[in-house]
């Protein structure tokens, strides 16, 4: 870890290198990563519906990994979850996780839209990736985790994972 680097910055850098090593930045497309993003976010919604804490934490981390990869593909060298600040005042109401997940799905739709349009609006797409990560931060906060906790857990899960890239999407061995 570099001297002034936060723990989450360190793990974001490791995730970017992991993606480079597997040719997911240059050898994949934002469209392919968007499919992976939808998959991981769907797992998060499933975890919340089932109230499965382990799946929720894993899915937050996995979704962050894909967001970091997409931001790198789109050329955002400055993307960092450390830049997120969200309002925690309205988070003490019952069933708020479901409301937050639905709001995040709106951001997911916006990301999909900006990835799919002919003249990509990269800045708006990155803005929606940040907004989705902010949603993840809110859900993590409700479960008493930080985004860094979720990212570190996800990285430790994937760092030595074997697999292959199929049509620009990382498929772990055994899937």
Regions found by a protein language model. Give the residues of each.
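Flexible "arm" and connector segments at domain edges
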Residues: 1-175
């Amino acid at each position: 870890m570099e001297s002034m680097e936060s723990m989450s910055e360190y793990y974001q850098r490791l995730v970017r290198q992991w993606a480079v090593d597997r040719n997911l930045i240059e050898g994949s497309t934002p469209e392919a990563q968007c499919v992976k993003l939808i998959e991981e976010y769907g797992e998060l919604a499933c975890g919340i519906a089932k109230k499965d804490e382990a799946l929720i934490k894993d899915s937050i981390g996995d979704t962050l990994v894909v967001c970091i990869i997409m931001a790198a593909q789109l050329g955002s060298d400055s993307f960092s979850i450390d830049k997120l600040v969200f309002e925690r005042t309205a988070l003490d109401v019952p069933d708020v996780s479901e409301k937050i997940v639905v709001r995040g799905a709106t951001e997911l739709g916006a990301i999909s839209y900006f990835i799919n349009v002919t003249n990509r609006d990269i800045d708006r797409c990155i803005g929606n990736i940040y907004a989705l990560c902010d949603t993840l931060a809110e859900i993590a906060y409700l479960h008493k985790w930080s985004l860094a906790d979720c990212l570190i857990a996800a990285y430790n899960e994937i760092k030595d994972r074997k697999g292959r890239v199929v049509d620009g999407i990382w498929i772990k061995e055994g899937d």
